[in-house]
C-alpha cells in the first residue's frame, strides 16, 4: 500500500463527492429540492482485498450519503447512492489481470471466480447503472432517500 495511491484514490473517489455536493447544495436549496446520487461500490459494502484505498473511499461515500440524506431532507433534497458490482469493461479487466498475477492464476479463472460471487453469474453493464440513476431522479422515486441501491446481480462476497 503506497501513500501516493491512498491519496490519489481518496482525492478522486471521496473528495470529488464532497466538492460536488458542497457546490450543488445551494443550487438545490434555491430550486427547492432535487436529487443527489453518489456513486459508491459493492466494495463499499464488503471490502475488497488488494484494493484497500478503493474500498475505504467507497465505504466513506455510503456514510456521506446517509448523513446528507438526514441533513437535506427538510429542503426536499433526496440523497442516495448506487453501489455497482463489477462493471464490464477495461477497469474490471485490469483488476482481473492484477489479481491473476498476484495469485499466479489465469485471467480466465479469476474472471470465472469473480462471476461465481454473483448470483446472476455476470458483470453489470453501464446501462444498468444509468437505469438506476434515471429511476432515482424520477418522480417515481420521490420518497426514496438515504438508500444504498446495489446494481450488482446480487454480489454475495468479494474475495
Task: Name these PLM-found stretches.
Residues 2-10, 114:
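Substrate-binding pocket helix/loop in short-chain dehydrogenase/reductase
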Residues 46-52, 74-75, 121, 139:
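Active-site loop immediately N-terminal to the catalytic Tyr-X3-Lys motif
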Residues 21, 57, 65:
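Active-site helix of classical SDR
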Residues 46, 133-134, 145-159:
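Short C-terminal tail/terminal secondary-structure segment
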Residues 1, 47-55, 67, 95:
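Active-site loop-to-helix junction immediately N-terminal to the catalytic Tyr of the SDR YXXXK motif
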Residues 73, 78, 144-146:
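Short, small/polar-rich loop/turn modules that mediate ligand/substrate recognition or access, typified
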Residues 41:
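Residue(s) in the substrate-gating loop at a strand-loop-helix junction
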